[in-house]
Amino acid sequence: MRALWVLGLCCVLLTFGSVRADDEVDVDGTVEEDLGKSREGSRTDDEVVQREEEAIQLDGLNASQIRELREKSEKFAFQAEVNRMMKLIINSLYKNKEIFLRELISNASDALDKIRLISLTDENALAGNEELTVKIKCDKEKNLLHVTDTGVGMTREELVKNLGTIAKSGTSEFLNKMTEAQEDGQSTSELIGQFGVGFYSAFLVADKVIVTSKHNNDTQHIWESDSNEFSVIADPRGNTLGRGTTITLVLKEEASDYLELDTIKNLVKKYSQFINFPIYVWSSKTETVEEPMEEEEAAKEEKEDSDDEAAVEEEEEEKKPKTKKVEKTVWDWELMNDIKPIWQRPSKEVEDDEYKAFYKSFSKESDDPMAYIHFTAEGEVTFKSILFVPTSAPRGLFDEYGSKKSDYIKLYVRRVFITDDFHDMMPKYLNFVKGVVDSDDLPLNVSRETLQQHKLLKVIRKKLVRKTLDMIKKIADEKYNDTFWKEFGTNIKLGVIEDHSNRTRLAKLLRFQSSHHPSDITSLDQYVERMKEKQDKIYFMAGSSRKEAESSPFVERLLKKGYEVIYLTEPVDEYCIQALPEFDGKRFQNVAKEGVKFDESEKTKESREAIEKEFEPLLNWMKDKALKDKIEKAVVSQRLTESPCALVASQYGWSGNMERIMKAQAYQTGKDISTNYYASQKKTFEINPRHPLIKDMLRRVKEDEDDKTVSDLAVVLFETATLRSGYLLPDTKAYGDRIERMLRLSLNIDPDAKVEEEPEEEPEETTEDTTEDTEQDDEEEMDAGTDDEEQETVKKSTAEKDEL
C-alpha cells in the first residue's frame, strides 16, 4: 500500500513539472505571440477546430524560432517623407482612429480587384487560392487584430517599396492638402485614402504592424514595423497563405475596444458594406446541437421507454444512439456585406440613405452627394450606372486640366471591376462626376488598352453625358445657384466651349450676374423672358469685376433705356459666349464692340444725322490728323451719355477684357501677341456730342486745326478712353507727361518751366559719432574735476600739518 502511495505521488510531481515546463516555453503577450498559434480552437468542438485552422494566424513558430527570425531579418529605415506622413496622419486623425479599418479593407479590396483582373487573361492566377475574400479576426488573448485578403499579394521588393517609401511629389501634395484642409476646418480623414497612404493609419491604433504577404511571383515574406523602422524577411514557414496578405496589428492599450466583435462589425457595416468582395468576421454564436448521451443517462431513458412499450417486436432495427439537445458557443466566419451591388438593384428598391452610404463608401468622401441618378441604359449597348455630383469640387480640379486622368468613374464588366484609369469615360469638363458603370456587353478577357478603343465605350460615354446633364438640370434652382454654380460653374462654361453636340443643353445651365439684380445670378432663359419688346439681341459686358463692368461707358445708354446687361466677370466667360452664337434665337452682342444699335423713330434719326453733320469737322480732324496712327475711324456715339468718349473694338477685334487676358497668357508662355491679327485691329473712337469737352474741342478745331493744346487734349482723351474701355496703355510715361502738361496749362504755369534744383549741402557728422565724442568729453571733464579735487585735498592736508 505504501508503495502504491509513493508511486501516485511521483506521478503527480511529474505531471506538475510538465505543466511548469510548458508554461516556461510559452511567450508573454508581446508581438512575438503574433507568430504563435491561436487558442480559439480550444473553445469549440472538433468540427469547429477544423474551421479554426482556416482562421487568420501565423502558425508554427516557437520563441527561439521567433528570436532567430528577428535576428536574421533585414532592417530598413523609413524614407523621410514616410516619417513626416505618419506623424501628420497620427497627429491630425487621432480623434478619428476608427478609419484605420476602412483603409485596410479598402486596400484589401484593391488587391482583390487586381488579382481578379489578372485572372481574366491568366488562368493560373488564382491557382494558389481561388477564394476572393477579406477576413477579419480579433484575438483578445494576444491583443491582436488580423485582416487577411486573398488578393494579388506583394513581393519582397514591393513590401519594401510600397510600405517603406512614397513618391516625394505625392508627399508634398498630400502635406499641402492636409494643411489646407486643417486651415479651412474641413475633415482630413478622407485625404489619406485619396492619396494612397491609408495603410499608415494602422499606427493610429497599433504599436506594431506585421504584414505577411504571398505573391504568385515570389515566396512568402514577413514585414514588421513599430513606426520607427521596419524589417523584411522570408517567412520560414513557407507558403501558408496560398496567395494574398495578412495584416496583423498589435493594438495599443487604449485601442482594446477594437477587439470587441460588435465594434468591428459596426465599423465594417458603417464604412465597407458596399465593398464588392465578401467580408467575413470570425464570430461566435450560440446554437442548440445534438450531443450523445452518457451511458448511464441512455440506460435510464431506455428503461423508461421499455416500461412504456413492453411489447416491442424482437426484429426491431438496430437501436440508434441516444442524444440530447445542448446549447453551445460555436465559432465561424460571419458574412458582413451580403448586399447585392447597389447598381444591380432596381432604383425603386434602393433607399436614399443607401445611395448616400454607397457614395461615401466608394468615393471616400465624408459629405452626402449633392445629386445622384440611377439608371439602366438599353439599345446598342446595355449597362447599369449610378452617377453622383459631389457637394464640393475635388481639390485641384483644374490643375493640369485635360492632361490628368479622371479617377471618378469605375468601369465594371459583368460585376468585375476593370479600371478607373480611362481617360475618356467622361469629357474633361465633367471630371467632377463620380460613379460606377457596369456592362455585360463589353469583353472581359482583353487588355485595358484594347478595351479603351472599343467602339461601345463611345456609346456609353454619350449616354453618360446626357444622363449627367439631366441630373444637373433637375437640381433645385436655389440649391443650383447657391451651391452647384459656385463649385462647378466653370466646368459648365468649359463644356459650352468644348462640347459642340451638347452646347444647347449646357447653355440652359449657364448662370451670370446681370444689371437686373445687384447680387443674384440669372439664367439665359430668365434674361430672354425679361427682354424688351423688339429687342433682338442679348447684351453683355465683360470686365475683371462687376464694379468695372457696370461702371463702363459702354453700358451707360443701355442702362438708361432700361435694357438688361449681362456682366461677364470670369476669364472664361467671354470665351464661353463667343462659342455660343445664339440662344433661343437671340444673338449675343458685346456692348464693347461695334454693332450696338437702338430702335429709333424718324425724328430721332433726323436729329442724329444732323449732329453727325455738325461734328464732321472734328471727326475728320481726329481721324486724319490728331489720332491718325491710333484709330480706324471716329464716329458720333449712340451708347454714351456721361462719358466724353470711348474706344470700341471691331466685330473681329478684342475687347479690353479679352486683350488683358490674352496678354497675360502670352506673358506666361513667353509669346509676343503684337503681331496677332486680332491684337493689331485698330479701334473706333466714339465721341459724345453732348459732352462739354467735345463741344469745346469742335469750336477750337474750327478756329485753328493746328492748335497744339487741342491736339494734346485729343490724345489725352484717347488715352483716357483707352483705360476706361478696359485696354492697357503701351506707354504710361508719355500719358503721365501729357497729363502734367495739361495741368500746367490749367494753372497758367509755363509748360517749359523747370523744376528747381535742390541745393547741395555739406555732409554732416553722424549722430553716433557726435554722441560718442560728447560722451568722451564728459568723461574727460569728470576725470579732470576729480584730479583737481584730489589736489585741493592734498594741499589742505599739508597746510593743516604746517599750522600744527
From Swiss-Prot:
Detected in heart muscle (at protein level). It is found in: Endoplasmic reticulum lumen; Sarcoplasmic reticulum lumen; Melanosome. The keyword ATP-binding applies. Residues 792-804 have a biased composition (Basic and acidic residues). Pfam families: HATPase_c_3, HSP90. GO terms for molecular function: ATP binding; ATP hydrolysis activity; ATP-dependent protein folding chaperone; unfolded protein binding. Glycans are attached at N62, N107, N217, N445, N481, N502. Residues 288-323, 750-804 are annotated as: Disordered. Residues 1-21 form the signal peptide. ATP binds at N107, D149, N162, F199. Residues 289-317, 757-791 have a biased composition (Acidic residues). The modification Phosphoserine is found at S64, S172, S306, S403, S447. Its EC number is 3.6.4.-. The modification N6-succinyllysine is found at K404, K633. HAMAP family: HSP90. Homodimer; disulfide-linked. Component of an EIF2 complex at least composed of CELF1/CUGBP1, CALR, CALR3, EIF2S1, EIF2S2, HSP90B1 and HSPA5. Part of a large chaperone multiprotein complex comprising DNAJB11, HSP90B1, HSPA5, HYOU, PDIA2, PDIA4, PDIA6, PPIB, SDF2L1, UGGT1 and very small amounts of ERP29, but not, or at very low levels, CALR nor CANX. Interacts with AIMP1; regulates its retention in the endoplasmic reticulum. Hyperglycosylated form interacts with OS9; promoting its degradation by the endoplasmic reticulum associated degradation (ERAD). Interacts with CNPY3. The SRT pseudosubstrate motif associates with STT3A during translation in normal conditions, preventing glycosylation of facultative sites until HSP90B1 folding is completed. Belongs to the heat shock protein 90 family. PANTHER family: HEAT SHOCK PROTEIN 90 FAMILY MEMBER. This is Endoplasmin. It comes from Canis lupus familiaris. The gene is HSP90B1.
